[in-house]
């Protein structure tokens, strides 16, 4: 049996405090591999190749997603809200999210502490697969390391003043965070605050290959 197969069989036992099973994307059924493209290269807007995540958390049900905390004030469901633009296999359960999603949750928790109020992630603004209709140019959302925030407390982020104010707080609070500038052209944002951690690949410690 290959080392990756052994890992898949034993997945879920290396993190006793976290309830989700880790899976090797290369061992998933064909329809999931086609949608997730685990470990494949995807070119960004500059033509540079970026390696897609290979290891994922398996979410068994929406009920599980509604209950599992990724951080003190963030539940898993907030990061996986998608609509019909997502690939059909990934609109039902089980669902799969890159392991790096936990890093994004920790950063958003720290950001929430800095702003002192609730932080709301947009629909289609957390994880979305490479097959999602919004996904292009190696979007960081397909790594699970980007979040689009549409509202903070009672403030909707639909104007320059609000977006730039909270963007500054994010950059001052989170070392290495990147935020989209305000504006309408591609690469800008005018109706949300985009935060991302870059192309992070999270590989579980028990992987041997």
PLM region spans:
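N-terminal secretory targeting signals
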Residues: 1-57
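Catalytic cores and adjacent binding grooves of peptidoglycan-active enzymes
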Residues: 6-18, 138-209
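Active-site acidic/histidine clusters and adjacent loop/turn architecture
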Residues: 58-115
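A broad, structure-centric signal for solvent-exposed, well-ordered loop/edge residues
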Residues: 59, 66, 130, 134, ...
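N-terminal start-of-chain detector that recognizes signal peptides
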Residues: 93-96, 118-124, 164-170
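Extended, low-complexity, intrinsically disordered C-terminal regulatory tails
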Residues: 103-136
């Amino acid at each position: 049996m290959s080392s990756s197969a052994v890992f898949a069989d034993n997945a879920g036992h290396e993190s006793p405090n976290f309830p989700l099973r880790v899976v090797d994307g290369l061992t998933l059924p064909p329809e999931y591999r086609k949608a997730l493209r685990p470990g494949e290269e995807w070119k960004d807007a500059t033509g540079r190749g970026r390696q897609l995540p290979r290891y994922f958390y398996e979410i068994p049900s929406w009920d599980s997603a509604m209950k599992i905390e990724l951080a003190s004030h963030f539940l898993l469901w907030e990061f996986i809200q998608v609509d019909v633009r997502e690939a059909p296999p990934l609109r039902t359960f089980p669902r799969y999210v890159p392991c790096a999603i936990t890093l994004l949750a920790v950063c958003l928790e720290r950001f929430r502490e800095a702003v002192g109020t609730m932080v709301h992630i947009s629909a289609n603004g957390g994880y979305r697969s490479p097959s999602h209709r919004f996904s292009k140019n190696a979007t960081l959302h397909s790594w699970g390391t980007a979040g689009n925030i549409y509202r903070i407390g009672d403030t909707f982020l639909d104007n320059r003043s609000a977006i730039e104010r909270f963007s500054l707080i994010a950059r001052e609070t989170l070392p290495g965070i990147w935020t989209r500038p305000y504006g309408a052209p591609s690469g800008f944002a005018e109706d949300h605050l985009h935060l991302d951690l870059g192309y992070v690949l999270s590989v579980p410690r028990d992987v041997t290959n």
